[in-house]
Amino acid sequence: MRCPKCNYHKSSVVDSRQAEDGNTIRRRRECEQCHTRFTTFERVEELPLLVIKKDGTREQFSRDKILNGVVQSAQKRPVSSTDIENVISRIEQEVRTTYENEVSSTAIGNLVMDELAELDEITYVRFASVYKSFKDVDEIEELLQQITNRVRGKKKRLNNDETN
């Protein structure tokens, strides 16, 4: 690893530890010539994953595109950036482990919706309203009814667990 200060090609690792995300190794290095210390990060190189869009075109998978959509949907909601980052990480991991080279944008959208349904209902509805491109109010009402039924089911299970 070249030193960022003097560009010398040899450095030694002073400290090595796993970064917070669990997928990266953080290394502190010291240049063997000028003794400058610097940090490097090491991560597994992942093969490109292509997303097949609804119109049939293909583009490279972008974690940032998913992140931007979720962040917009979660604006002014009690959803922390850590929660959002965890959701995005789970989605990316699921996509990369389930699909080898290509994944449909529909599959990604469904994964996002599943995650958001568990995270925050309003964020879920906001994302769904853009993702699903609702044509009329009836479609939105149907989605809200599904959410209401799911919430009632959860409350019912919780009440049953408390009484047992």
From Swiss-Prot:
Top-rank taxon, per record: Bacteria
Domain (ATP-cone): residue spans on this chain: 49-139
Cofactor dependency: Zn(2+)
Record text on cofactor binding: Binds 1 zinc ion.
Pfam families cross-referenced by the UniProt entry: ATP-cone, Zn_ribbon_NrdR
GO terms of biological process kind: negative regulation of DNA-templated transcription
UniProt entry keywords in alphabetical sequence: ATP-binding, DNA-binding, Metal-binding, Nucleotide-binding, Repressor, Transcription, Transcription regulation, Zinc, Zinc-finger
GO terms assigned for molecular function: ATP binding; DNA binding; zinc ion binding
Leader peptide range in chain numbering: none
ZnF start-end (unnamed): 3-34
PROSITE patterns to which the protein is assigned, alphabetical: ATP_CONE
InterPro entries according to UniProt: ATP-cone_dom, NrdR-like_N, RNR_NrdR-like
Protein family membership: Belongs to the NrdR family.
Function: Negatively regulates transcription of bacterial ribonucleotide reductase nrd genes and operons by binding to NrdR-boxes.
HAMAP family documented for this protein: NrdR
Protein name: Transcriptional repressor NrdR
Gene it is expressed from: nrdR
